[in-house]
């Protein structure tokens, strides 16, 4: 393990809750971005950080096979033990949401939590692409322009929104704004 789980909180007054981004808690195995690097996160310790930070809702954006690939077998049970509500919406790595209805429903669920003053954290494998896209869309839904939302997410967690397609998705989401992407 390489230190406590880091949650990067977006600095915004759009809602009374807090929006954070992180990487997959408890992930284990070979890094995709850094050859030779092994992830050895401790699931219980990472969820302990989430609980101490007061996280109420955790949105995993990874696909089902990634839970196995990253040796995250205790993920769902650990969330349950900590009283953290899971709001999953799988998105393929380095891509954009394919199921727009499901993604729109996720954004609405997370927005409701933020407006209720809860702490919401979104994550993908590395906490950059899918997590950044989702956080930026929430900021747009909350009232920011797409360019400002992307910039805020990138200030909050450098390297977020990894592909041009992901950034374009946020801008397209802004033009379609009305609650669904």
In which residue ranges do the predicted regions lie?
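Cys-dependent protein tyrosine phosphatase-like superfamily
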Residues: 1-121, 134-181
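Ser/Thr-glycine-rich phosphate-binding loops at phosphate-binding pockets of nucleotides
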Residues: 131
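Short cysteine clusters
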Residues: 124
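Conserved G/P- and acidic residue-centered "switch" motifs that form tight phosphate/ATP-binding loops
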Residues: 127
């Amino acid at each position: 393990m390489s230190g406590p789980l880091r949650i990067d909180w977006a600095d915004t007054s759009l809602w009374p809750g807090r929006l954070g981004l992180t990487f997959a808690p408890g992930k284990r195995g070979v890094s995709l971005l850094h050859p030779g690097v092994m992830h050895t996160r401790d699931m219980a310790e990472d969820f302990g950080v989430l609980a101490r930070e007061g996280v109420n809702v955790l949105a995993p954006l990874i696909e089902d096979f990634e839970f196995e690939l990253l040796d995250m077998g205790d993920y769902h049970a650990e969330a349950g033990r900590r009283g953290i509500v899971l709001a999953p919406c799988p998105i393929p790595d380095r891509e954009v949401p394919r199921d727009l209805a499901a993604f729109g429903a996720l954004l609405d669920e997370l927005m409701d939590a933020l407006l209720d003053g809860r702490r919401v954290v979104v994550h993908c494998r590395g906490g950059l692409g899918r997590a950044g896209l989702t956080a930026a869309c929430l900021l747009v839904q909350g009232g920011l322009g797409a360019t400002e939302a992307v910039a805020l997410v990138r200030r909050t967690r450098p390297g977020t929104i990894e592909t041009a397609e992901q950034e374009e998705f946020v801008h397209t989401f802004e033009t379609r704004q009305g609650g669904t992407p």
